[in-house]
């Protein structure tokens, strides 16, 4: 209930784009967020690969607790190669995120969708944009508060040549 109230407050304070197409993670909180922020969207799709990274043994535990654990620290250290039991390997997660962004834009081009919203999780946003957005930034520099994100755009030349988008605003 607290999260829903925060989203409704954000919606009252800020102007979210009016879009007809919304892509969201299949997780309940993402679908609910999409419904609150984009209630008039005519087409809402849940996309399995927009889900957050699988945390395995660390699933559903507060980050403030996890940062105290050595195995978690190893896992989030770039290049460590450590994968906790049941977790999604970091390289696989990043590959999935990059591929999903490609698929979303390819769908939009094929279906002539000029504006859409994507409601997903912080780690997915950071991964997608660090790999496929200009300006080029490290993942943590793309962090967004809950209910917030980025407006990105591309053009045919930039997309066909480099498979990149350009971040132009914060939502």
Q: Where are the regions a protein language model picked out?
A:
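Phosphate-handling substructures
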Residues: 37-96
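Generic beta-sheet signal
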Residues: 113-122
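Acidic, His/Gly-rich catalytic cores of divalent-metal-dependent hydrolytic chemistry
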Residues: 162-171
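Glycine-rich phosphate-binding loop signature in dinucleotide/nucleotide-binding domains
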Residues: 15-18, 104-114
